[in-house]
Design a protein with these regions (language model features):
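N-terminal transmembrane alpha-helices
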Residues: 3-34, 38-39, 52-67, 71, ...
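Short runs within selected transmembrane alpha-helices of multi-pass transporters and secretion channels
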Residues: 65, 133-152, 159-167, 192-208, ...
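Helix-terminus/linker motif at the lipid-water interface of multi-pass membrane proteins
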Residues: 23, 27-45, 113-120, 176-187, ...
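Transmembrane helical elements of multi-pass membrane transporters/channels
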Residues: 13-32, 132, 166, 199-203, ...
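Transmembrane alpha-helical segments of integral membrane proteins
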Residues: 176-177, 397-406
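Short alpha-helical transmembrane segments in multi-pass integral membrane proteins
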Residues: 1-18, 72-138, 184-242, 298-363, ...
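Small-residue-rich hydrophobic transmembrane alpha-helices
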Residues: 44-107, 140-159, 259, 272-336, ...
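Hydrophobic/aromatic residues in alpha-helical transmembrane segments
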Residues: 16, 32, 68-69, 108-109, ...
Length: 445
């Protein structure tokens, strides 16, 4: 225990700012939904459609940016700030090209929005909101890339503060532009989109300014300025980033398709499913935050070639995530019905949602452990296996099992939710197995 205590403290110190920043994102999402919903039902429906379309893009961009963190942490572990700064330049190129490819696809899809089965009366709301949110993705990519760089230097507080202030600006912008306060025009859903765009521009510029002007990053700036762009180095970043982006994209896609299947049952089932997934994000938020903190620790020790400490850092992260999963499970068991009533008072929806509390609890440990060992792998930068593990777990197991349990077995939403557990409990041991394979190549001294 005494050997693990420093690792507990360090992982918590890194993870808590990430968690606080993510709580801010969730609060902003709730505020957006409530304000748009109170403005007009058509605006809420249009926002839900566009946000669901861009949700997968957001996860792909976010996952892709995660490839940079362990590379930077490894350089920092060796004291190579010049090299870490140069790596940021290559990562910005790689992330920019990846985002442009995704936005090109989304631009093509824009011209087929009217073929996606949405009510015709929503299209005048959907089209401008789609354009604004799509444009904001460029700034999301820039913020994510630079934030993963600062996180990799063990500075997780900077990203937290910028996220929190950006979210506050977004909420203020919503009030001014959705409803038209004072000299500001009443723009409804478009106002919410513009507020999101402006807040994302602010966050991107703010984190760039921190790296460009803060004294802490002076040595990194020297490396950034002195390092020329290199296609070889950019491709190297891509090989470490693309597997993580695709892994998170497939995981997100499995959850999205599970929602679609719930909608095949009826509207109350879809509503209940969405409510429980939203509640479940509270657990996911903490698992991923502290998993990211553990990943930074692992990468730092990999950079030092200290594999004994890699093992200790991973074990400490596992203990923290198990404790978080236990706390989340108890919270959902005790307060689940209260959380559900916060979202809806419809008795049919509430009844279905309450029946999903136990399946929600079941998947907490699978989720925590797959996040633990996925992040441990990410910390070692041995990430190629993450693609096939995600494909097997989420595409081969989760989605077909959801259909089989939900429909032929007549378990409906309960079956679809249980299939999520099957996917997560498939991913967790596979990630663990791959991490152990990496450790066997580097026996502790």
């Amino acid at each position: 225990m005494s050997k693990l205590l420093p690792h507990y403290k360090a992982t918590l110190r890194l993870g808590i700012p990430i968690a606080i920043g993510q709580i801010g994102v969730i609060i902003m999402g709730f505020a957006d939904t409530m304000m748009v919903g109170r403005y007009a039902t058509e605006a809420l429906a249009s926002a839900s459609f566009v946000n669901s379309v861009f949700n997968l893009i957001s996860f792909l961009i976010m996952g892709y940016s995660y490839g940079l963190t362990p590379l930077v942490s490894a350089h920092c572990g060796r004291g190579e700030k010049h090299e870490a700064g140069g790596l940021l330049k290559q990562a910005l190129m790689a992330n920019g090209l990846f985002t442009l490819v995704l936005l090109t696809i989304m631009t093509v899809l824009y011209f087929y929005v009217d073929c996606m089965g949405q009510p015709p009366q929503l299209l005048p709301h959907i089209r401008p909101y789609y354009i604004v949110i799509g444009t904001s993705m460029l700034f999301v990519a820039l913020f994510n890339a630079v934030r993963q760089f600062t996180d990799g230097t063990s500075d997780t507080a900077t990203g937290m503060w910028i996220l929190l202030t950006g979210n506050a600006l977004n909420i203020i912008g919503n009030v001014l532009l959705i409803y038209g306060v004072g000299p500001f025009p009443e723009l409804g859903l478009l106002g919410a989109g513009l507020s999101t765009l402006f807040s994302r521009i602010y966050m991107a510029l703010a984190i760039v300014a921190v790296v460009a002007f803060r004294k802490r990053y002076a040595a990194y700036r020297t490396g950034f300025n002195a390092t020329p762009l290199s296609w070889r180095a950019t491709r190297f970043v891509n090989t470490k980033s693309l597997p993580i982006g695709l892994q998170m994209g497939m995981e997100s896609g499995a959850f999205t398709f599970s929602c679609i299947m719930a909608g095949w049952i009826d509207a109350p089932s879809l509503a209940a499913f969405q409510v429980m997934l939203t509640i479940g994000t509270l657990g996911f938020l903490f698992y991923y935050s502290f998993g990211s903190g553990m990943s930074i620790r692992v990468a730092t020790f990999v950079g030092l070639n200290d594999w004994h400490q890699v093992r200790l850092a991973t074990r400490a992260g596992q203990h923290i995530l198990c404790a978080m999963a236990t706390l989340s499970s108890l919270t959902f068991l005790i307060l689940g019905p209260t959380f559900i009533h916060f979202f809806t008072h419809d008795p049919t929806v509430v009844g279905i949602a309450v029946s999903l509390i136990v399946p929600l609890i079941i998947y907490q440990f699978g989720d925590a452990m797959q996040i633990c060992y996925a992040n441990a792998l990410r910390g070692t930068s041995q990430v190629m296996s993450m693609m096939w593990i995600a494909f097997v777990s989420y595409i081969v197991v989760n989605i077909p099992a959801g259909y089989f349990l939900g429909f032929p077995c007549h378990l409906k939403t309960t079956g679809i939710f249980l299939a999520i557990s099957l996917g997560l409990f498939t991913a967790a041991p596979l990630f663990y197995w791959q991490f152990q394979k990496v450790l066997k190549k580097h026996p502790a001294e």
